[in-house]
Amino acid sequence: MAVRIRLKRMGAKNNPFYRIVVADSRSPRDGKTIDEIGYYNPLKNPADIKVDVEKAKKWLSNGAQPTDTVKILLKKVGVIE
C-alpha cells in the first residue's frame, strides 16, 4: 500500500480550506483517509498552516511520501528541511 501525505479539500464553494491527511495513493482526493495531521487555510493573510509535527514525522519515517504542495507546507512549518 503506497501511502501519501496530501491535501483534502473542505469548505464551501469559492471558500476552500484543506486538511493535511495521510491516505492510500489510490483513494480519491476527498475519499477515505488513514490519519489527519493538520490543516491549511490559504484564504487568510498570511495563510494559516497547522501541523501536528510528531504525527508528520512518524508518517514520514514510516515511508509516507508527501505531494509537492504538502512538501512545501511541511518545509514552512519546519518538519522537513
UniProtKB/Swiss-Prot annotation:
One Pfam family recorded for the sequence: Ribosomal_S16
UniProt superkingdom: Bacteria
One GO location term (cellular component): small ribosomal subunit
InterPro entries (alphabetical): Ribosomal_bS16 (IPR000307), Ribosomal_bS16_CS (IPR020592), Ribosomal_bS16_dom_sf (IPR023803)
Listed GO MF terms: structural constituent of ribosome
Keyword annotations from UniProtKB, A to Z: Ribonucleoprotein, Ribosomal protein
GO BP field: translation
Stored PROSITE patterns: RIBOSOMAL_S16
Family matches, as NCBIfam families: S16
Entry's family note: Belongs to the bacterial ribosomal protein bS16 family.
Matching HAMAP family: Ribosomal_bS16
PANTHER family, A to Z: 30S RIBOSOMAL PROTEIN S16, SMALL RIBOSOMAL SUBUNIT PROTEIN BS16M
Protein name: Small ribosomal subunit protein bS16
Source organism of the structure: Caldicellulosiruptor saccharolyticus (strain ATCC 43494 / DSM 8903 / Tp8T 6331)
Gene symbol of the encoding locus: rpsP
